[in-house]
Amino acid sequence: MGSGKAFLFSPSLLWSQTRGVRLIFLLLTLHLGNCVDKADDEDDEDLTMNKTWVLAPKIHEGDITQILNSLLQGYDNKLRPDIGVRPTVIETDVYVNSIGPVDPINMEYTIDIIFAQTWFDSRLKFNSTMKVLMLNSNMVGKIWIPDTFFRNSRKSDAHWITTPNRLLRIWSDGRVLYTLRLTINAECYLQLHNFPMDEHSCPLEFSSYGYPKNEIEYKWKKPSVEVADPKYWRLYQFAFVGLRNSTEISHTISGDYIIMTIFFDLSRRMGYFTIQTYIPCILTVVLSWVSFWINKDAVPARTSLGITTVLTMTTLSTIARKSLPKVSYVTAMDLFVSVCFIFVFAALMEYGTLHYFTSNNKGKTTRGRKLKNKTSASPGLHAGSTLIPMNSISLPQGEDDYGYQCLEGKDCTSFFCCFDDCRTGSWREGRIHIRIAKIDSYSRIFFPTAFALFNLVYWVGYLYL
């Protein structure tokens, strides 16, 4: 063989070379896998971005303006939707912000509401990725709006600060929502027979002004009306009990109109009138009874007390009437004040009667003694006896009896015997014997008992019956 170096095969060298190739192949595989995953992620991200762009394309102001211009082109806001085809259905909803105050003098109440109306207008349908157009009040005058008015409103104010409190929304299917905030002074005719224990249902009525029911139909959007928290309402003398809504039809010369009504049930709080009227009246009546325990000879004290209580009741009755309208019927408070006045006046008259007859008693006793002295020597009469003319009838009287006549007059002598010297004699049997000196004792029992019975009947009758 020729000369040269011999090639020597080494197993260790072959193993190291194979190991290096495997390592390089593994690194290449990992690198390619990362590249593929990154590429897949980028593809998924691009696909997601493409989907988002397709479902929600960006809407520009020019697109909305173009939609509005196309809707208003050829639109006549003087004509209602579906005129000549079918009635326009108006769904109404009311949110009550507050009620009060209630004015019983003018018989009206104030209410703050958000009034919402919804209807369909096929002329306002549009095709767009936007489902609803949220517009301000400037658009209201350009489309047809229902001519709804509040029938029992005396004064209504729309809120304009800082901007007109009106909202208009148009959906792509032609549905229109129109809301506005109103403050209304509405009539509420109060029946004051049970005042101040009265309850009232104050209505709020609205309907179309010119469209009868064959043109416009009103419906409630919800079964009940929503209200804010009543504890912030300025009802003062009243408490909010609840509300209810109804639908009625009014028959008029111009047609049949649908009337929507909300009734606000109110109950009067008695705290103010209890403190201002009832308690002072009761205390004044009780004060008038003090005269029954004062000596009947204390004329200035009993007279001044009686006159003072009468004048106090007159003042209380005048003050109580100031919070009421000038109604022609008697209210529950009028009845109570009048009865209290009668009790006070009767207490004064009781002392007047007592003083009158006790004064006559003394004068007639003196005259009777003089007459007895003159007739003591007359024949036919035993000693110690005298004849006293009593309504054309002469009766013998003892020396210890009063020498004065009974009450003059047919009625009195027929039913009453008012003095001690009238108690004897068969012709006085069956009559009521009243001793003038004991009228105060009778009054101490009669007046409180009668007043307590009146209060029992009064409060049970007005509060529970």
Swiss-Prot record:
Function of the molecule: Gamma subunit of the heteropentameric ligand-gated chloride channel gated by gamma-aminobutyric acid (GABA), a major inhibitory neurotransmitter in the brain. GABA-gated chloride channels, also named GABA(A) receptors (GABAAR), consist of five subunits arranged around a central pore and contain GABA active binding site(s) located at the alpha and beta subunit interface(s). When activated by GABA, GABAARs selectively allow the flow of chloride anions across the cell membrane down their electrochemical gradient.
Catalytic activity: chloride(in) = chloride(out)
PANTHER family: NEUROTRANSMITTER GATED ION CHANNEL
Organism: Mus musculus (Mouse)
Record PROSITE patterns: NEUROTR_ION_CHANNEL
Disulphides: 188-202
Membrane topology: Multi-pass membrane protein
A GO term, aspect molecular function: chloride channel activity
Chief location bin: membrane
Segments on the Cytoplasmic side according to the record's topology features: 295-300, 350-444
Protein family membership: Belongs to the ligand-gated ion channel (TC 1.A.9) family. Gamma-aminobutyric acid receptor (TC 1.A.9.5) subfamily. GABRG1 sub-subfamily.
Domain of life: Eukaryota
UniProt-annotated glycosylation sites, renumbered to this chain: 50, 127, 245
Tissue: Expressed in brain.
Biological process terms in GO annotation: chemical synaptic transmission; gamma-aminobutyric acid signaling pathway
Modification(s) after translation: May be palmitoylated.
Keyword Transmembrane: yes
Protein name (Swiss-Prot/TrEMBL): Gamma-aminobutyric acid receptor subunit gamma-1
Subcellular location: Postsynaptic cell membrane; Cell membrane
Keywords on record: Cell membrane, Chloride, Chloride channel, Disulfide bond, Glycoprotein, Ion channel, Ion transport, Lipoprotein, Membrane, Palmitate, Postsynaptic cell membrane, Signal, Synapse, Transmembrane, Transmembrane helix, Transport
